[in-house]
C-alpha cells in the first residue's frame, strides 16, 4: 500500500547520503585507539585503498589479503590496530586451527573460538593408488579412494575432458614432493670398520673376528703367558712412558695387539735401575735420592 500511495524507491535522502559518505566522522584524537566495536570504513571497502583520514579514521579498515583472524584481537590485546597483518573481524571460516583438536583430536572447551578441522579431511590421496597399485595396501597412511575407470580415456580419448565423472588415471611416476618419508627408498647403512654397504660396524664379520682374536691375546697375557713377570694393567700404565719408544715402530691395523716391553728393558724413573716398574721400586719413596747420588 505504501508503494502505491507514496513510492520513494527512486529518492535518496540527505541522511542516507551522509551515512554513505561518512559525513561528521570525527578523526581519532590518538593513534592506535581500539576500534574493535566500530563499523567498517566504506571507502576502503569500496576503493580497496586507505581513506583520506588514514590511521586517524574512526572506522575499521579491513583488507582482503588478511585471511586469518588475529588471535590477540579476539582477546582485546592487539596493539597494531589497522597495521596488523591479521584480520580484525570474527569469521569462523578464517579462524586459526585449534591446537588441542589438531594435536590430541579433542578439545574440551565448549566455547572454543578456533577452528576444528576433521583429521580425515587432511589425509591426502595416495599417488600410487591413483596410478593403479599401492604396496602398502590398507596400512598406507594416505587415502585410498575407489573410483570408476573411464573406458574412453583408457581407449585413448575422453570427450568430457577434466569434467568427466569417471577416473582418468595417471601412469607417470609420482613426484618426490607427493611421496612420504616411508615411501622413499631407505639409504643403505655403511660399515665404519670395513667400508662396505649393507651392514653396520657392530654386525661386521671382520670386526667380530678381530675382536675375538684380541680377546684371546689379552686372556693369554693375564694368565702369565709372557715371560718376565708382566704385572697386568697396573704395570702397563706405569710403564707407558717407556713403551712410547716402540709405539711408532710397531704397525697398527685391525685386530693388532701391541706386545708389552720385556721387564728387563723397563727403566724405573725413581731410582734409574732396570728390571722393575716405579710402583714396585724396592727403595721406596726415597728412591729419587739414590738416583741423584748415582748421577753425581
Swiss-Prot record:
Keyword presence, Lipoprotein: no
SMART domains registered for this protein in UniProt: ZnF_C2HC, ZnF_C3H1
Any one GO MF annotation of this record: RNA endonuclease activity
Statement: the UniProt record of this protein carries the keyword Chloroplast: no
Subcellular localization, as worded in the UniProt entry: Nucleus
Renumbered residue ranges of the record's region Disordered: 222-254
Assigned keywords, A-Z: Developmental protein, Endonuclease, Hydrolase, Metal-binding, mRNA processing, Nuclease, Nucleus, Repeat, RNA-binding, Zinc, Zinc-finger
Organ and tissue specificity: During oogenesis, expression is detected in the germarium, in nurse cells, in the oocyte, and in the somatically derived follicular epithelial cells (at protein level). At oogenesis stage 12, nurse cells degenerate and their content is transferred into the oocyte. In larvae, expressed in all organs and disks (at protein level). In the larval salivary gland, expression is initially confined to cells at the anterior end but later expands throughout the entire gland (at protein level).
Function: Component of the cleavage and polyadenylation specificity factor (CPSF) complex that plays a key role in pre-mRNA 3'-end formation, recognizing the AAUAAA signal sequence and interacting with poly(A) polymerase and other factors to bring about cleavage and poly(A) addition. Has endonuclease activity. Binds RNA polymers with a preference for G- and/or C-rich clusters. Binds single-stranded DNA non-specifically.
Domain notes: The N-terminal region containing the five C3H1-type zinc fingers is essential for endonuclease activity. The C-terminal region containing the two CCHC-type zinc fingers confers a binding preference for RNAs that contain G- and/or C-rich clusters.
Subunit structure: Component of the cleavage and polyadenylation specificity factor (CPSF) complex, composed of at least Clp, Cpsf73, Cpsf100 and Cpsf160.
Identification of the protein by name: Cleavage and polyadenylation specificity factor subunit 4
Gene (name only): Clp
